[in-house]
Regions:
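The substrate-binding groove and active-site-proximal loops of carbohydrate-active enzymes
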Residues: 53-63, 85-103, 150-171, 183, ...
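C-terminal beta-sandwich/jelly-roll accessory domains of carbohydrate-active enzymes
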Residues: 452-466, 470-472, 477-550
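Catalytic-core region of carbohydrate-active enzymes that cleave or remodel glycosidic bonds
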Residues: 278-288, 315-418
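Polysaccharide-binding and catalytic clefts of secreted carbohydrate-active enzymes
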Residues: 145-317
Length: 550
């Protein structure tokens, strides 16, 4: 009897503890985007989160055995988030029959390795094509028509003009999100990308019968209403096309935008956007995580049809913003040398910067671009592609960059959107020419003159300058944190009424959010008090207090 009573009491206690613990998981807030000043932040577990990620190669997450062997490499790269795809063909091998084995295993492995996930939905389109559609979609081309080129030839691209395709993609995506809602009370998945690099090839638009019929219809009222309401802020490309036809409030596509290939791209972009909007809405209705789209960029000098056309490119932002208002933002995939130029285009009042594919992992400029993106453009996250590609990261710049950015995360997240932080990176042209000239920026009553070489480094190669970058955060009236690699910062009075000196300069690190002071830097290490100089051989942090004198 005594043992029985003890057992009953223990059982009752266990039930009480279980019931008390259950709401904790259930009450863990959903990841969300939240405005702070002039930007938006990703909120995870109720707190701002700086996403330091890496995107897996396309097929790495399709096998749990393969994926399980990748985590040590990912952890050595310094990530806090992995970006990984889930495939329609693997999730729904038979229509209406779903297999979440790989997804569940991915979640479990990420938790075991203390990582968050950004999930990529490889559905109807991945890099323009439809190779991730299930076999039952691929084979049934009458139910799921293909896009056609100008010559009428079918392409291996599902047409966005098919309501049946939209219904099938929505059903699968919503099923994934419903499963996540049930399986991920820990909020391991913090965001979801809807499709991947949508765009039309090899022509500017779909020339199939469904598309041709849509082209003859009136331009939808929500699009013309958006153009009218945002006329002064429209991108020059869209505004020029619209105003060239008289800035009409209604009419056919030809009447409102003309008949050029540029006008055809607008037409195709609208239908991609509205398809994506409906798909995103279905996913959010099932489980309301932040959702975004990404885009492959167009090369200079290429016309629509000569690049993956009609995706959410900067010159088409207005079409996508009007057609896909449920999508939270547009992310940038960039593999061109002119990173600084492209990244600036994606930071807008209505679009926080997120870089899911920041060129290939292992490149020497990855770290410098991360500091620029986060410091200057308030990026919510940064992620090189093919993070599981390098054999090791022992000699790579990424772990050092992410280590410093992790230490600075509380300061960065506090400063975002408030005008308390600047970032620096030497711009590079598309042809690869590095602009080595010093840069100036205003911050907290000071003018910052930033160079990418010390005065005695006269013969630096452009390739050496390209891998240098950093950020500056104001932490007090005359106090700043300078972090990065190879940058030299001279502080001047913004009004020019006083001279500025370095009162105290130290190197150090943040441990559990508290500054741990290292060497006091003076003499040669500050050029006798003239400037703050970050080491050229790795990413570091320095803290400086300034004084003014006359």
């Amino acid at each position: 009897m005594k043992a029985s009573r003890i057992f009953l009491r223990l059982s009752a206690l266990a039930l009480c503890l279980a019931s008390a613990a259950a709401p904790v998981l259930a009450d863990t807030p959903l990841p969300q985007l939240r405005k702070q000043g002039t930007t938006s932040q990703l909120i995870v577990d109720g707190k701002p989160f700086l996403l330091l990620g890496g995107e897996l190669h396309n097929s790495s997450a399709s096998s749990l055995d393969y994926l399980n062997g990748v985590w040590p490499l990912l952890k050595s790269a310094g990530l806090n988030t992995v970006i990984a795809p889930v495939e329609w063909d693997q999730i729904e091998p038979r229509e209406g029959h779903f297999d979440f084995t790989v997804l569940d295993g991915m979640l479990q492995q990420a938790r075991e390795n203390d990582m968050r996930i950004v999930l990529l939905w490889f559905g109807a389109w991945k890099n323009s094509m439809s190779s991730y559609a299930p076999s039952w979609v691929k084979h049934d081309y009458q139910r799921f028509p293909r896009a056609r080129n100008r010559a009428g030839e079918p392409q291996d691209i599902l047409t966005p003009f098919s309501n049946k395709l939209l219904a099938a993609d929505k059903a699968a995506f919503a099923a994934v999100m419903r499963h996540l809602k049930d399986a991920d009370s820990q909020r391991t998945v913090v965001m979801v990308q809807v499709e991947n690099e949508i765009g039309m090839l090899p022509d500017v638009r779909d020339f199939g019968p469904l598309a041709d019929a849509a082209l003859k219809q009136q331009v939808p009222a929500p699009l013309t209403a958006y153009l009218k309401a945002n006329r002064s802020a429209l991108t020059p490309h869209v505004r020029t096309l619209w105003e060239a036809q008289g800035a009409r409030s209604s009419g056919s596509w030809a009447e409102v935008f003309g008949t050029s290939v540029e006008a055809e791209e607008v037409f195709q972009a609208w239908h991609y956007a509205t398809f994506t909007n409906a798909l995103t809405a279905a996913g959010k209705a099932a489980y309301g995580l932040p959702m975004y789209v990404n885009v492959a960029l167009n090369r200079p000098g290429k016309k629509p049809g000569e690049y993956p056309s009609a995706g959410p490119l900067p010159h088409l932002f207005d079409i996508w913003k009007a057609g896909a208002p449920v999508v939270d933002f547009i992310g940038i995939d960039t593999y061109f040398p002119n990173y600084v130029e492209w990244a600036r285009k994606f930071k807008r009042p209505d679009n926080p910067l997120f870089v899911p594919e920041a060129n290939y992992a292992g490149r020497p400029d990855i770290g410098a671009n991360a500091f620029f993106s986060i410091g200057e453009l308030d990026a919510i996250g940064y992620s090189p592609f093919g993070i599981d590609g390098p054999k090791d990261y022992s000699k790579d710049t990424l772990p050092g960059a992410f280590r410093v950015l992790k230490q600075l995360s509380p300061l960065i997240l506090s400063a975002q959107g408030k005008g308390q932080m600047r970032g620096f990176k030497a711009p590079v042209t598309y042809e690869g020419k590095v602009d080595v000239r010093p840069q100036t920026a205003k911050l907290g009553g000071y003018t910052l003159e930033v160079s990418f070489n010390a005065p005695w480094e006269k013969d630096l190669k452009e390739s050496d300058v390209d891998i240098r970058g950093g950020l500056v955060i104001q932490t007090g009236e005359n106090e700043f944190i300078v972090a990065g690699k190879g940058i030299v910062v001279v502080f001047k009075d913004a009004d020019g009424k006083a001279a500025v000196g370095l009162d105290k300069l130290t190197e150090g690190s943040f441990v559990d959010g508290k500054w741990k002071e290292g060497r006091w830097l003076n003499g040669d290490e500050s050029h006798q008090g003239r400037h703050v100089q970050m080491p050229a051989d790795g990413f570091a942090i320095q803290k400086v207090t300034l004084y003014k004198f006359r």
